[in-house]
Amino acid sequence: MMMISLQRRLALMAAATAVMALAGCATQGPSQQALPPIVFVHGNGDTAALWQTTAWRFESNGWPRERLHAIDVPYPLNRDDDTKAQPGRTSAAEHMAYLKAEVDKVLKATGARKVVLMGNSRGGNAIRNYIQNGGGEQTVSHAILGGTPNHGVWAIPGFREGSEFAGTGPFLKGLNAPKNAAGDEVTGPVQWMTVRSDNNDKFAQPDGLWIGQKGTPTNVTAAGPELKGATNVVIPRIDHRETSFSPAAFAAAYQFITGKAPAATAIASEARVAISGKVTGLGVDPLDAKTGNFSNNLPLPGAQLEVYATDPATGARSGNALLRTTVAADGQWGPLVVPPGAPLEFAIAAPGSATTHISRSGFPSSSSIVHLRAERIADADKTAASVVTMTRPRGYLDPARDQMLFDGVPPVGVPAGAGAASAKIKPEGPQRSVAAQFNGERVVGQTWPAANGHLVFLELTY
């Protein structure tokens, strides 16, 4: 079921295995009868939904679904200055407090004494803060950080040092202070692992291009995510998000926790697939468009959701809606039993938002974190005939690395170096099919008129 080129998959797996063998990172793991709960912590501006494929891979290797928990931070974006309140943003302390509360819930629900924490990017900041400053050294057995900017996205004295991403700022300097005579940067007795790219993580670059400071040295290298005292894994060519969501990153995490390689990184199919999730919006208040267009993970009550099976070749709807529902106060929808492997279209309509059409590949397995966001049309797009976005939430698009087509041609405006996770086109003419292809995965949808308030997203799963 892996929707990724065979050549690249084998290269990533071989690289991860080789690096892990050299690092000697096979830790003493639990028995199959006592697999620990895993709490997944998403990155900046992201959602629990990004952990969907990772959870599937753990389940495919025998991990109980009820012992896999992905948190969903209500306001997932960091503050520009961590010391100053900012509407719709979460401070490092608030982030840590939310994680602590979620860990407590998981411990109570499972009866376990400790959890494994697995975080991507900013999620690793919260994990480190919780273990060092929030009592997590007593409740966490393993901490796995993918692409976390542990020494900053930049480390420029005097430059935005109030940000939690500043390597010279008080937040990261406090976390990185030596913990023992050896100078370890990690807090014991927790076992730590970091996963990074060799040079393809946009937030671990020596030049300030991605922070709007092209030509300025960041004083950060590709090794920035590593921590002294941790097992540090390097996987060639993966991007910032793939440090957590790629099959190779999963394999590294599984072996670190259990002491043995996973039986498979492919996702096992279920005979009966049931999906559910949450519908969210944008801004400080998703019901008030005037409060901003930035991401949140707050429920969007009153939104109308329709789900359709679609034709794999054309993206056209196949028959009547599988689900037509009004979202309740908690934002939750489902569970909905869907045809295993059948591609789907999700259509969300809500006041103040565009009617958002999301086309996705078929679901091989059940998931309760199929979260959906109602988007808004950008001012620059309001006169377009239609607006279609190819998006890859669990990784970036890299024309120097990946095989991609968007509406039959390579995506326009996507730079080499895994710096973008989406591409947009504005097709003219009547309704028609549009396809997005990425390393073997193909998602097909239909155009819808932007003038009538519609947006289309072709969302890649892998």
Predicted regions and their residues:
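Bacterial N-terminal signal peptides that target proteins for export
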Residues: 2-14
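C-terminal motif of bacterial Sec signal peptides marking the signal peptidase cleavage site
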Residues: 21-24
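N-terminal non-catalytic accessory region
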Residues: 26-118, 122-158, 261-274, 280-462
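Helical cap/lid subdomain of alpha/beta-hydrolase-fold lipid enzymes
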Residues: 47-49, 83-88, 92-113, 125, ...
